[in-house]
Every structure is written in C-alpha cells, then in structure tokens.
Curated annotation (Swiss-Prot):
Subcellular location: Cytoplasm, Cytoplasmic ribonucleoprotein granule
FFD box, short sequence motif: residues: 310-326
GO CC terms of this entry: cytoplasmic ribonucleoprotein granule; ribonucleoprotein complex
Superkingdom field: Eukaryota
Knocked-out gene: effects: Female mice are infertile, whereas male fertility is not affected. Oocytes display impaired early embryogenesis, defective progression to meiosis II and disrupted assembly of P-body-like granules. Show a reduction in the extent of mRNA storage in germinal vesicle oocytes, as well as an aberrant mRNA clearance during meiotic maturation of oocytes. Primordial follicle assembly is severely compromised in ovaries.
Record protein name field: Protein LSM14 homolog B
Family: Belongs to the LSM14 family.
Motif TFG box positions after renumbering to this chain: 330-350
UniProt keyword list: Acetylation, Cytoplasm, Developmental protein, Differentiation, Isopeptide bond, Meiosis, Methylation, Oogenesis, Phosphoprotein, Ribonucleoprotein, RNA-binding, Translation regulation, Ubl conjugation
One GO MF term attached to the UniProt entry: RNA binding
Sm domain mapped to chain residues: 2-83
Amino acid sequence: MSGSSGTPYLGSKISLISKAQIRYEGILYTIDTDNSTVALAKVRSFGTEDRPTDRPAPPREEIYEYIIFRGSDIKDITVCEPPKAQHTLPQDPAIVQSSLGSASASPFQPHVPYSPFRGMPPYGQLAASSLLSQQYAASLGLGAGFPSTPVGKSPMVEQAVQTSSVDNLNAKKLLPSKVTSATQLNGRQAQPSSKPASDVVQPAPVHTQGQVNDENRRPPRRRSGNRRTRNRSRGQNRPTNVKENTIKFEGDFDFESANAQFNREELDKEFKKKLNFKDDKADKGEEKDPAVMAQSEETAAEEDLLGPNCYYDKSKSFFDNISSELKTSSRRTTWAEERKLNTETFGVSGRFLRGRSSRGGFRGGRGNGTTRRNPTSHRAGTGRV
C-alpha cells in the first residue's frame, strides 16, 4: 500500500484497483486480517479507465454504502486523502450521546458504536485494528464485518468484490426506525430529528399495562364465541351429496302371493265357524263328535296357555291389553287433581314463582329516572303456592 507510514489509514479516502483493472474510490472502514478482506464505505466505481483488460467496464454513477474486497483480488491501494480532523468530546463513560448545534460542521456523534450502513461514526473514535469494526458488526448480527451477499451485477465486480447498493440496503431494513441523529449520507448537515425514517420498518407500538391487560382478557371471549358458533353450526356443513346404501329391486313386488300367505279374512272365517259350531252343539245338547271335542280341547288348551295375564297377542290385535286411564276412568282429571298428582310425584315446587311479583310492581317515572312502587302489587303478587 502506497502512502507514508505515519498516515492513519482508517478513515482515509482510498483508491483501490482490482485485478479486473477496475478502480474504486471510497473511505477505508476496516481491514480484516483474519479473512483477508478490506471494507470501503461510500464507494464509487470508475471502471477500467483505459487500462488493458479483456473485459472493459464503464464507470458507474451509483455510490455504494460499502464494498468488501477480497485481499487476493486487489492489485493496488493508494491513499488519496488522510482522514479529516475530528473535534470530538473525550471518551467519557458518563456521556451517553451528544449533539452539536446546527452551526457546527461536525455531525452528530453517538457514543454507542454502530455499523456505517447509515453514516459512519467519526474515524477519530475508531481504533486502527479490525477488532473494533468486528464488534460493531457483531452487535448488529452481521457476522465478521458486513453481509456477504454480493449485489453488484457487473461480471468484473463479482470476481473481486462483494457490494451492496443503497436501494438494497433500504430493502433489507436493518436499522432501527427512529433516527435521532443528524447523520447525513451526502455530506450535508441535517437538523436532529425524531421522526421515523420513510425507508425503515416502523416499530411495534408500545402497549401500556392497561392495554396489555385488556388484550389478555379479550381473546378468550373471542375463542369461546367462535367455539359456540362452531357448535351451533355443527352438522350444517356436511356434504349433501353423500350417497346412502339403497336397496335395488329387480322386479315389482308381488302383492298377491304375499296376501295369500297372510289372508286374514279366511283365518277369521275359519275361527268363527269353529266357535259357532261349538256353541250350537252346546245349546242343542247334541252329542259331540270326538274329533270336534279333541279340536275344541286343543283350542281351549291354547287359550289357557295364554292365560288372563297375556297383555299382548299379535295374532288378535296390534294393541296391548295394559290398563290405561281411558279404560280405568271415564272422566277427565281436573286441574287440582293433576296438580296434586304432580306434587306427589315431583315434590313441592318453589315458594315464590318467577315473574309473579313483577307485574305492576315498579313503574318508572317519566323524565326524572325515579321509580315508584305500587303498594297493592306486592300484596297481590306474593307468589305463594
């Protein structure tokens, strides 16, 4: 590296030529001896500038916030300007941050170190080693120095450098939203401002204790309401095109053959003939045929088997013979009897019936918001059973 040995290189304006014969100018920010990289801030590419190369590159107007150069791909480094003298406060641990007036040419100097993505800190506050810059980047979660994602689109630049433009930096949103310093990107002085930057992500709103408590109480009610909605709508969202198992019939139903098996009229006629024949024989006192007697005995035996306690006989009727109120009592029960039966069955109900004492009990006055008690309504609506 050319330049006098006593020149403080950090903060100096550096002219760097890569092996691709492309010249860059920027401010030296850090030299990483472990990774063999050099980082420049506020970098501009001047192209190949008539240097002999197979792939010439034109100059570019963009100013990059930073570019990290690989040491093995650097051809020459020249110090163009030494760092400007910085008139800063002494390193006092009692100072949290400071700001000069608008008449001063020195920008706002925060005491807390940060990365040079949004304006570099004064180089008088930096040490000459790369360890300090690594600590800055580590505090922002940026690894050893800077992000390693190459952004430069030129094939010449991609071989030797890793770049990031201002637009790409704005897209990444790496900085806090509140900018309370007067740091500027183009060298012009700006007033201290506490307004949020337009290209930075806005912070989450700070909730007070009352708001946090309200937010902690409200979601369970929403979830319970949604649960009730789901319970009410259960079964309504079922698909309507579900096909049930249907029975397929090959032909029409034969009613004649089915009725022949269950011909109720013929069975009733035969049964009546047997009863009438037996009654006639008994009335006339005629001698009974032994075959008829045997048949009548079988019928009587069948009736005895059924017995008087046979409450249901499907051959005789669909209905049973269990006693009911229609058979036992011919008259309707009165309201008092039904109430007595309910009391014996379910017990005594509550003494005060709901809603009786509220009939005419209170009447609101018009306009004054007062209430008036009706003296007769309380006696009329005692609610006694």
